[in-house]
């Protein structure tokens, strides 16, 4: 309940600002203030770090590097991932599923983000949205896939990790 109240307050006070150093389609949600404080600067740094985690997730997928991909997830039995209609409880179960489904790397496709949005809810809790398209250049008959991934990230020590993920997609 407390997180919902924080998210509601944040969404009412947000403005969206492009970060020039981000390079892609990063939308940063921040509380509007008249001046920049040390807390604002810290929030910007943390938001950029979270963005980098989400970009790493996409990059590792495109590199067909499942170990690198899994490094962005919280290595815990409490990790929760819902991909389309399947639910995976725990890091090991998600990893095993990826290994089984991605035996042929050409079936993984190439993912491109169309939007990455990061909202820092608390100093150690964030929400992210990644809108993406996937192509299969090795398979001329495959459809393009369009999807959205939402993630909750927590900061453990100094590292941001995905603790909850939901992905939905459709073929075009």
What are these regions (language model features)?
Residues 66-120, 143:
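A solvent-exposed, acidic/Ser-Thr-rich amphipathic alpha-helical stretch
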Residues 1-7:
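Bacterial N-terminal signal peptides that target proteins for export
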Residues 24-30, 146-172:
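Short beta-strand edge/turn micro-motifs at domain boundaries
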Residues 124-134:
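A short hydrophobic beta-strand element
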Residues 7-17:
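Bacterial N-terminal signal peptides
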Residues 20-72, 76:
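Short, low-complexity N-terminal intrinsically disordered segments enriched in polar/charged residues
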Residues 98-99, 113-119, 132-134, 148-154, ...:
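Hydrophobic/aromatic beta-strand elements that line small-molecule binding cavities or substrate pockets
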Residues 138-140:
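Outer-membrane beta-barrel domain signature
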């Amino acid at each position: 309940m407390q997180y919902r109240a924080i998210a509601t307050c944040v969404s009412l006070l947000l403005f969206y600002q492009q970060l020039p150093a981000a390079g892609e389609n990063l939308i940063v949600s921040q509380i509007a203030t008249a001046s920049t404080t040390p807390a604002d600067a810290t929030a910007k740094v943390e938001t950029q770090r979270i963005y980098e985690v989400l970009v790493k997730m996409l990059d590792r997928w495109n590199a067909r590097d499942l170990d690198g991909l899994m490094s962005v997830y919280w290595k815990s039995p409490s990790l929760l991932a819902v991909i389309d209609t399947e639910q995976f409880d725990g890091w090991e179960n998600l990893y095993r599923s990826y290994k089984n489904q991605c035996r042929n790397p050409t079936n993984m496709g190439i993912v491109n983000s169309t939007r990455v949005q990061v909202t820092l809810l608390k100093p150690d809790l964030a929400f992210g949205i990644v809108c993406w398209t996937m192509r299969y250049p090795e398979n001329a008959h495959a459809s393009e896939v369009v999807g959205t991934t939402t993630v909750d990230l927590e900061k453990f020590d100094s590292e941001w990790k995905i603790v909850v993920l939901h992905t939905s997609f459709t073929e075009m």
